[in-house]
Amino acid sequence: MRRWLLALVLFIALATASLTVYHNLSASDRRSTAAIERTRDLAILDQRIEFYAARVVKEPHGALDIGRLSALYLQRGRQTGSYEDLSRAETAARTSYGNRKARNSGAAMVLAQSLLAQHQYLESYAVTCSVAALDSTEIEPRALKAELELELGRYSDAAASFKSLEAQKRQLPVATRYARWLEIGGHDIEAREMLFAAESLASKQFRMPSEQRAWFHLRVADFALRHGRLAEAASALSRGYDVAPDDYRLQALQARLDAARDDWPGVLRAGNQTIAQVLDPATLGLMADAAAIQGDSAGSAQYARTMLVAVAAQPGPYHRAAALYLLDHHGDLPEVLRRTEADARVRQDVYGLELLAWAQYRNGQVAAAMQTIDRVLATGVNDAQIEFHASEIASANGDNARAATLRSKARSDNASLVALRRESGH
């Protein structure tokens, strides 16, 4: 017993010393260390995928090895942004679950998560509901079900799902999803506090893959940026870089932060680091704007064309960021409206309805746009872009007083919104 206790004390002492050394490193050294570790971890992940892929070739009708392979593909897809790996994860998980449904909820969850990552919301929801129904005590399926209800805009169902998760709302599988639910209802203070708590908890999970820990920093940064807290967003991004300095999701958000700061060369720097890994349509649209603002019309047009190519190559529904770019840059307005209407028939979430309202407005359907944006505002969400679009629609509808109120609220919620600053001549 004493020997076991001594070993435990020694382990804790060594772990504490290692953490102390790590935190005393400069930011540059921490990121260099993290980059080396991520390269090593990705190489190990590649080897594990090769190992299980070889086993599956020998035993294609099993479930366990194929299920493990699907989880590894999903992990690599998340880390690298590879759509091919997400598709491989879906195929392997579907095969594993098809081979054996009993005691194989892990494969079903990988299937649901890979479908969600490819924006196949309805099928992901169906799979998740079937898993959640098998065991109501499992947190992850219930939390994913609630998240998908938010994605689909089924807010009554989401309310019931999150109510059932109230006791677990601080746990990592639930916390960021619960925070998003709070934000949609206008409870921003509680949402922010919950995101910070989840980030702090995740940062201590050293066995958690780096891309997952980085994701919690990303959520804090994204919330801060959308609410005009630029220094807070930059700080969260810095913490994310300490974990995953080459994470394309962090770089994409960095480009958005640079745009909010009018740092258009910075947008292109961060954007180039993003698209070197993943042709993200939202980032390409932002880069097109950055190039245009700096007088590079040819470069702007090239980024815009690349964005359209990237959208065409991606699976799933129409990319919302690309749709917004086209609406604001005189693209094919009737086609964008048609695609946006099709998306809204599946997803009735606030951001999809906001985009539909903006497409209706750009196509001259002002009355319909007002009805649609009113549905969004009725949720209580505080979002400067939504309020800016609502103010434009209200003005076109002849309600100048309401337009002014909405514009004022947008400035209060996020004065750094690019559209607001352009209007002010900044």
Predicted regions span which residues?
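N-terminal leader/linker segments that initiate helical-solenoid repeat arrays
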Residues: 2-106, 126, 405-426
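TPR-repeat structural position
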Residues: 45, 79, 86, 121, ...
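Alpha-solenoid helical repeat scaffolds
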Residues: 46, 50-53, 87, 94, ...
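Generic helix N-cap/helix-start motif at coil->alpha-helix transitions
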Residues: 63, 100-108, 134-142, 169-177, ...
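Residue at a conserved register position within TPR or TPR-like alpha-solenoid repeats
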Residues: 73, 80, 115, 149, ...
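Structural motif corresponding to the intra-repeat A-B loop/turn of tetratricopeptide repeats
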Residues: 76, 80-83, 118, 152, ...
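Amphipathic alpha-helical segments of tetratricopeptide repeats
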Residues: 91-98, 133, 166-167, 199-203, ...
